[in-house]
Amino acid sequence: RQRQMCIRDSMKSIIEGERALCFWLSQQTEVSLYHSDEKIRREASELVSLMTPVVKSMFTDLGMEITSDAMQIFGGYGYTKDQGIEQLYRDNRITPIYEGTNSVQAIDLVFRKLVNKESDIINRYIESLKKDLSSKNQELKNFNEKLENSLKTLIKFTDWIKDKMQKSKNDVSAACND
């Protein structure tokens, strides 16, 4: 019983995080289309372009994980047609393939958006996150520490990608889906 509660709480937190990210990306899309300042519209459009494949891949991969967890909650019965979870699992299995497989989206992200000579979208995004981290709000202290560690990983990976792009694009292609 305890394991089922842990799985359910994990599923709930993933879904709520995805929902918040979806709202944020939708807001950026609105800004990119309707803001009165051309520069702000362009920056929002670039941010949407950068984040859309990340969000698509994350949502579809985690959707598969959540559906699998839902099936596990029911044990052997989850695999049968009685509960309907098996149908959800089958229906969800196609989502990483729709609109370009997650692997193809990852290659496009890295080769066309992450290492973009015309505009350095990723660095502007990182700078905006650093600015958000500078908040001295004590309620966000634990969250900010975790975000800062994740940001360091993102910077390290981005620098690695940019360095490898100069030397071996095959290494970069192999790392795209990670």
Model-derived features: positions:
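A generic secondary-structure signal for well-formed alpha-helical elements
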Residues: 15-33, 63-66, 70, 74, ...
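Charged, amphipathic alpha-helical oligomerization/scaffolding segments
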Residues: 10, 14-17, 54, 58-65, ...
